[in-house]
A protein has these predicted regions:
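Metallo-beta-lactamase
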Residues: 19-131, 135-138, 164, 241-248, 316-318, ...
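Cap/insert and terminal regions of metallo-dependent hydrolase folds
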Residues: 120, 240-326
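Bacterial N-terminal signal peptides
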Residues: 8-18
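Active-site metal-binding loops of divalent metal-dependent hydrolases
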Residues: 56-57, 108-111, 144, 170-171, ...
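Divalent metal-coordination and catalytic microenvironments
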Residues: 48, 97, 107, 136, ...
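Histidine-centered catalytic micro-motifs
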Residues: 139-149, 225-232, 293-300
């Protein structure tokens, strides 16, 4: 299924608040069945940094509708191997980095834009660790899709009034120019949503675009990997010889795209490049034993990639720790 035909088929509502956005877009979300959890966080150190994974919630996903360069039977087989069935549940993760001087968010979840019951839990997760929106000094946006920028606003106002938003210049140039919708065929609603989220900060002078390989904050280097969007970014964060890379939407479904990285998703602006980026990055992460964090892997979305041969990979979450001692 092509991106254009998929968008045409679902006939989404024109009102932003009713439109199912980027990663959470499905033909119809089922009536909400409660799987409510207490605010979810997972804290771990990295050198002198304190990092907290924050849950913005989860959403159900019909992979038969969303995944491309595959067939439903193949998807079902891969899911079966991981004891899963379609539809699956997708995590929406954000991350807080504290270095003593700054409180830095990586992505902001979906905010109000998925509708009641789906996402929008980031502020509650922050509150559970004693952090308010006003405490946030910087926000690193991996790419401009609503499940990463939706939490930037509440009722049209900036959720994080003191924060500077850092985002790749190619994404700014693409999504804040609505003429690109007609030129490329990418759905108009993504541009509308960008204007209502990242655009609010841009008008306030609170957006700092970055180029590839830019050091955007001390110990934070951004690299741009075109494919999912024109300005999709990784953030390599280092402290005292340790590092973690925040990888954005290089991966959506662990059970499917780790064993078969060539499988893409309808939201990829350039699916061929997105698949190539994924294959190359997975191999590098595995070879380097690199710790990574991803917004749509099962919460907390932090762990390592292992090369399993023949272009296949496996995912290994960090071990769970819950103690005060060293």
């Amino acid at each position: 299924m092509s991106y254009r035909s998929f968008v045409h088929s679902i006939a989404i509502a024109s009102t932003i608040g009713l439109a199912p956005p980027a990663w959470a877009e499905t033909p119809a979300l089922p009536a909400a069945v409660s799987h409510q959890q207490v605010p979810d966080t997972y804290r771990f150190p990295l050198g002198k940094l304190d990092i907290v994974a924050l849950s913005d919630g989860t959403v159900p996903q019909d992979l038969h509708q969303l995944l491309t360069h595959t067939k439903p039977a193949e998807v079902d087989d891969l899911l079966h191997r991981s004891f899963l069935d379609n539809p699956v549940e997708a995590s929406i993760n954000a991350f807080l980095i504290t270095d003593g001087a700054r409180r830095i968010l990586v992505d902001t979840g979906s905010g109000q834009l998925f509708g009641p019951g789906y996402g929008g839990k980031l502020v509650d997760s922050l509150a559970s660790i004693g952090t308010t929106p006003e405490d946030i000094t910087d926000i690193l946006i991996t790419h401009i899709h609503t499940d990463h920028t939706g939490g930037l606003v509440v009722d049209g106002r900036r959720t994080f009034p003191n924060a500077t938003v850092h985002v790749g210049k190619p994404d700014i140039d693409f999504f804040l120019d609505p003429s690109n919708a007609a030129r490329t065929g990418y759905a108009q609603k993504y541009f509308d949503e960008a204007a209502k989220t990242i655009g609010v900060y841009d008008k306030a002078g609170k957006v700092k675009p970055f180029a590839d390989r830019a050091t955007i904050l001390p110990g934070v280097v951004a690299t741009i990997h075109q494919g999912h969007t024109p300005g999709s970014a990784f953030f390599n964060v280092t402290s005292e010889g340790q590092s973690i890379i925040f990888v954005g939407d290089i991966i959506h479904v662990a059970a499917v795209q780790f064993p078969k990285p060539s499988i893409t998703i309808v939201y990829d602006q350039d699916p061929t490049k997105a698949a190539s980026v994924r294959q190359t990055a997975f191999a590098q992460f595995a070879g380097d034993r690199q710790l990574i964090a991803a917004p749509h892997l099962p919460f907390p979305g932090v762990g390592h990639v292992r090369a399993d041969g023949h272009g296949k990979f496996g995912w290994f979450p960090v071990e769970y720790r819950n103690r005060a001692g060293q």
